[in-house]
Amino acid sequence: LGLLLVESAYLAIFFRLMTGVFLALVYPPSLKLISTWFRRGRGLALGALVGSITLGLAAPHFINAIGWLGWELVVIATTIATLSGALIIGIFVHEGPFPYPRAPFHMGRIGQVFKNRGVLLASVGYFGHMWELYAMWAWFLTFSRMAFIELNIDNPSAASFFTFAAIGIGALGCIVGGIMGDRWGRTATTSLMMCISGTCALLAGFVYDGPLWMLIALGLIWGFTVVADSAQFSTIVTELGDPMYVGTALTVQLGIGFMLTVVTIWLLPLAAASLNSWQWVFLILIPGPLIGTCAMLFLRRMPEAIKIANGNR
């Protein structure tokens, strides 16, 4: 909301940075909090949480697609939604019947967290996943706008609606991924989703200039799979990590993962400027799901994996 009150670019950037900081402070505690309500079905529970975040992230694209609304109304609408969420949590949400021991974050415990090979591999998988996820979300609107122009569809609202659909369908993906993770296994689910999303990153350039139905189909499949596995990495940490260090482990995993997103979000427009086109920029994202898949397949073969998803690995 501060963006509406300032005229200085520096202050606007500051408010954007603070938005990111406070979002980061919400995410790890919310994952830990919802985990205290579930011993079985935890993957679905965390998947539903990440799915709601995904739908919330997609919502501004829908608001933006309504052409007569200015960007100011987009900011106001999303701010109202955020404050409503805070009010609901403050009044109705509390810790569940399966709490973790209370232990403050401690830098000295980071080494202990990563001495756990299962947590380490789950985190590497998450890092690969994050290399792809937020860059896709951040630049898919620009990619689709440029692609639509190539297809003689010069309508920014159409690209915004498409981006809303491509990102928003990830909410359903998170729920499906949670169900698959609980029933079929988390390492198998994450590996499958990263294989599909990585393939979509590879194929995006080939459908850039049509046909339109292939571009739309790829966008929806990519949006569904790119985030469907997101909650499963954190769920694995809650299952394999020392209960005393779960909060620290989640914070470290998420913190490093979000730092990696800065790299790919920064790289993609540089690549587009260098190539003078957005057609092939998503190739930069492929190493993420490739490395992440390898990490999860290694984890699947470890004896500790029997603790994941009640033995479903």
What are these regions (language model features)?
Residues 15-51:
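Cytoplasmic helix-loop-helix junction between adjacent transmembrane helices
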Residues 25-38, 228-242:
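Intracellular juxtamembrane helix-capping segments at the cytosolic ends
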Residues 40, 48-93:
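Helix-loop-helix hairpin linking two adjacent transmembrane segments in secondary transporters
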Residues 80-99, 292-300:
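C-terminal membrane-cytosol helix-exit motif in multi-pass small-molecule transporters
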Residues 90-112, 305-312:
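Flexible cytoplasmic inter-helical loops of multi-pass small-molecule transporters
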Residues 118-171, 234, 264-265:
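Extracytoplasmic gate region of multi-pass secondary transporters
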Residues 169, 181-236:
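C-terminal transmembrane helical hairpin of 12-TM major facilitator-type secondary transporters
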Residues 240-275:
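A late C-terminal transmembrane helix in Major Facilitator Superfamily
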